[in-house]
């Protein structure tokens, strides 16, 4: 499945490609981490064939980005798009339009694009500032309703995933906050920055699939 990125924070693109190669292979570029010339060459060939980037001169408005995405659908056959992050778009709300109204219309526009071209559109958005509990000092877990700007980020999404990095203990947690068709899956990933090991745990159950008595439920993974 071919993918297109609009990711201004990963410019120059060569740096983004480096990140993608490390994720694709599971090996870092440092000496002794297993990255070989052959593995690098195969990875570069795969990315050249399957990954495209949207780069624009001037204002990167949602309409301009979507126009480039349409070109990638037609010319390259892209069916997955990642817009990362939302706050790097050049937004142009109409006069008198509130932030909530603007975001609602914008999400409708993204949804219509994904539906029309049968694409998966992944939108990365940042939460509002989360205040620590004055008594415990703990920061509450971010949920989709905490995304800065509008509750429609939860209401209008088909799927919602929250990535939480706990730098104090070196753990990254991935919560599935919403699945529109709840029979599909539930899961929560936890990744240790020290051991690089993943663990699946029911940190947030999305659904309990119906199954015959005595049947086992296979593990669902992201």
Question: Which residues are covered by each model-predicted region?
Answer:
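Cytosolic-facing regulatory segments adjacent to core modules
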Residues: 1-77, 188-190
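Structural recognition of the conserved hydrophobic beta-strand(s) that form the central parallel beta-sheet
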Residues: 5, 82-83, 119-126
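Cofactor-binding loop segments of dinucleotide-utilizing enzymes, especially the Rossmann-like FAD-
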Residues: 8, 126, 165
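Flexible loop/turn segments at secondary-structure boundaries
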Residues: 11-16, 23, 88-92, 129-132, ...
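Amphipathic alpha-helical segments in well-structured domains
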Residues: 13, 103-107, 146-150
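Conserved, well-folded catalytic cores of nucleic-acid-processing
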Residues: 23-27, 85-92, 113-116, 124, ...
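Phosphate-binding/switch loop-helix module in NTP-utilizing enzymes
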Residues: 52-116
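C-terminal regions of RecA-like/P-loop NTPase motor modules
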Residues: 63-78, 112-117, 129-222
